[in-house]
Amino acid sequence: MILRSLSCRFLTIALCDAAEPWQLGFQDAATPMMQGIIDLHHDIFFFLILILVFVLWMLVRALWHFNEQTNPIPQRIVHGTTIEIIWTIFPSVILLFIAIPSFALLYSMDGVLVDPAITIKAIGHQWYWTYEYSDYNSSDEQSLTFDSYTIPEDDPELGQSRLLEVDNRVVVPAKTHLRMIVTPADVLHSWAVPSLGVKCDAVPGRLNLTSILVQREGVYYGQCSEICGTNHAFMPIVVEAVTLKDYADWVSNQLILQTN
């Protein structure tokens, strides 16, 4: 099979970004969007550590200095104007520092390319995905279309991830602007690939768009992230990013196979 031969060729040099056992951090970023999400997480985590240390210091100090032994007669404090101003302004400033980059990233995630190089349509079914490449057909021809099913647990090949590998991967060119159109054929689904920073819901009756720029060659694993029925856990997503030349060869071979 053409897709499997391409997969074997690039498997030795390409990174495989998938979930790992006992993983605590993010997967390696493969798009500017995911890199922005990771950077924002690290920046916010820095503020969280500062707040945690300050609150713990206040609690320990209060327990140490204001107990029955050191302060047998407690003071009755109704209010303090200075401290109230401080604990109102200081958290507001922290939230402002967090909100500015958060909104900038949020608006960049909502941006849709006006003229993408490639458009791919992902259609969610119970329980598999269908992909359409409609840029390579004329008006009277069928789009390049294929279904993507999970590899059964009892039939994996050497090196394949359990419940994450599929029979037909989504092949895309690296360093090329892509537009993903996501929609379902039945119920709610969600097309999500963590390394790409993409999670696009498939809502019945709607076409949702998202833009992707894969910056490096590799194999990226995801799953349906919206509960969609009994076999929801068996709807993996595999995106393989290759060079533009190999992508063109793959498209040509797929078109030949489809016409035959």
Curated annotation (Swiss-Prot):
Family matches, as PROSITE patterns: COX2 (PS00078), COX2_CUA (PS50857), COX2_TM (PS50999)
Keywords of this entry = Copper, Electron transport, Magnesium, Membrane, Metal-binding, Mitochondrion, Mitochondrion inner membrane, Respiratory chain, Translocase, Transmembrane, Transmembrane helix, Transport
Query: From which domain of life does this come?
Result: Eukaryota
- From the record, give the transmembrane residue ranges: 44-64, 85-105
Query: How is the cofactor bound, in the record's words?
Result: Binds a dinuclear copper A center per subunit.
Q: Which residues lie on this side of the membrane: Mitochondrial intermembrane?
A: 1-43, 106-260
Q: Which InterPro entries match?
A: CcO_II (IPR045187), CcO_II-like_C (IPR002429), CcO_II_C (IPR034210), Copper_CuA (IPR001505), Cupredoxin (IPR008972), Cyt_c_oxidase_su2 (IPR014222), Cyt_c_oxidase_su2_TM_dom (IPR011759), Cyt_c_oxidase_su2_TM_sf (IPR036257)
Q: What is its EC number?
A: 7.1.1.9
- What name does UniProt use for this protein? Cytochrome c oxidase subunit 2
